[in-house]
Amino acid sequence: MDRRNFLRTASSFALLAAGATTGVSRVFAKTPSFSLTGNQSDENTPNMGDTMEYRKLGGLDVSAIGLGCLPMVGYYGGKYDKKDMIALIRRAYDKGVTFFDTAEVYGPYTSEEWVGEALAPFRDKVKIGTKFGFGVEEKQPTAINSRPDHIRRAVEGSLKRLRTDHIDLLYQHRVDPKVPMEDVAGTVKDLMQEGKVLHWGLSEASARSIRRAHTVCPLSAVQSEYAIWWREPETKIFPMLEEFGIGFVPYCPLGRAFLTGVIDENSRFYEGDRRWNLPQFTPEALKHNMP
């Protein structure tokens, strides 16, 4: 595959809500609306239609557009009703989405619980990606922790919350500088041999970390932020993924809703919205970056 086709293919994996979809994110100036009135298929089969494309991600068959389930637990401000979010997840499935992204730290735990409940009726028809790597069980959700014993406990917890006997795609959420990557990869390899994990990947990892991990246990995917306004993965990450045949899953492909047109220079975010802390979303930056 040449570089142009690789970039085109890679960029089509869009975890929409992982960086704030227009349907879930909240801004003062222009708050989009969404409908949750879709009817679920009686056959528990997604509506493939003519609009959804499907891809190979390592050995996984996934929809080209996935649903990231971080904003549902208020990461971008606001509080959302469990019933509505389960309906949203199932509506995405009705529209052909078969790839869902979550993590133990989202909530913490809440996102996995909602995803597990929402997808239970058609679990065998979807692929779920989740993540380990933060000190959630120690009540330190911002502390990085990828010790082997912690990984095992995190996976057992995720399996329970997701109501499943296996995780389709398990990511290390962030690289732990205190734990050798070889130890992390070796632990996940053991979990794969036990059938609890089918594929694994890294999130926001350097090229060096990717190489070290892949040497011990081949990676299926790497997840990083990637959008028109953030193309850093093109420099070192994409060439390595192409070399090793590893898939790429971008998060925030819509620039945390900035690229959707629902945000303008007058937008101000709700209290609790994490975008307040990002330099791209200061009033000065919004004004400067408007087309």
List each language-model region with its residue ranges:
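A short acidic, helix-capping loop that chelates divalent metal ions and anchors anionic groups
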Residues: 73-76, 135-141
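Short, acidic/polar
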Residues: 79-92, 147-160, 208
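Conserved, mostly hydrophobic/aromatic
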Residues: 57, 67, 85, 100, ...
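N-terminal binding-site loop/beta-alpha segment at the start of enzyme catalytic domains
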Residues: 2-127
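Active-site groove signature of glycoside hydrolases
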Residues: 160-177
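Alpha-helix N-cap and loop-to-helix initiation/capping positions
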Residues: 80-84, 110, 114, 142-150, ...
